[in-house]
Amino acid sequence: MAERTFVAIKPDGVQRGLVGEILGRFERKGFKLVGLKQITPSRALAEEHYGVHKERPFFAGLVGFITSGPVVAMVWEGDGVIASARKLIGATKPLESEPGTIRGDLAVNIGRNVIHGSDAPETAEFEIGLWFQPSELNDWSPSDQAWRVED
């Protein structure tokens, strides 16, 4: 199985109508969407997702923000998808993100940076398991697979 990563369009990205733009960037890169849903996260889900930041001063604000509205949760699959997604997304701080990245082009500030992406294989596995049931992920092969990826 190819590598998988978790990506979430945060409430600011959903409210600003950026879902199609962001999905398109991942599709044009050649990654395969295997899981997709819109959900307003519960406080418990948000606290577990951001648990590594629990002792940080911004934790409460982060949890409050991510639970403030709908999030588009996605699982993308492809060779090197974790590292590639991080490059597509850009730096956490939008002012440090390169033009052409999602945050460089679309994000306003660190508190409203539009998108989240897993940063490592272990994180991706944890986040996918947290946000998706196995039955919500679809194994499928695009008809143009041979034109995108070398065997």
Curated annotation (Swiss-Prot):
Reaction(s) this enzyme catalyzes, per UniProt: dZDP + ATP = dZTP + ADP; a 2'-deoxyribonucleoside 5'-diphosphate + ATP = a 2'-deoxyribonucleoside 5'-triphosphate + ADP; a ribonucleoside 5'-diphosphate + ATP = a ribonucleoside 5'-triphosphate + ADP
Pathway assigned in UniProt: Purine metabolism
UniProt cofactor(s): Mg(2+)
Enzyme's top EC category: transferase
Any Pfam family hit: NDK
Keywords, sorted A to Z: ATP-binding, Cytoplasm, Kinase, Magnesium, Metal-binding, Nucleotide metabolism, Nucleotide-binding, Phosphoprotein, Transferase
Gene3D superfamilies from the UniProt entry: Nucleoside diphosphate kinase-like domain
Main subcellular location: cytoplasm
Positions of the catalytic residues: 116 (pros-phosphohistidine intermediate)
GO cellular component: cytoplasm
Residues binding ATP, per UniProt: 10, 58, 86, 92, 103, 113
Cellular location(s): Cytoplasm
Gene Ontology process terms (BP): CTP biosynthetic process; GTP biosynthetic process; UTP biosynthetic process
HAMAP family: NDP_kinase (MF_00451)
Assembly notes: Homotetramer.
Family affiliation: Belongs to the NDK family.
Record protein name field: Nucleoside diphosphate kinase
Organism of this sequence: Synechococcus sp. (strain CC9902)
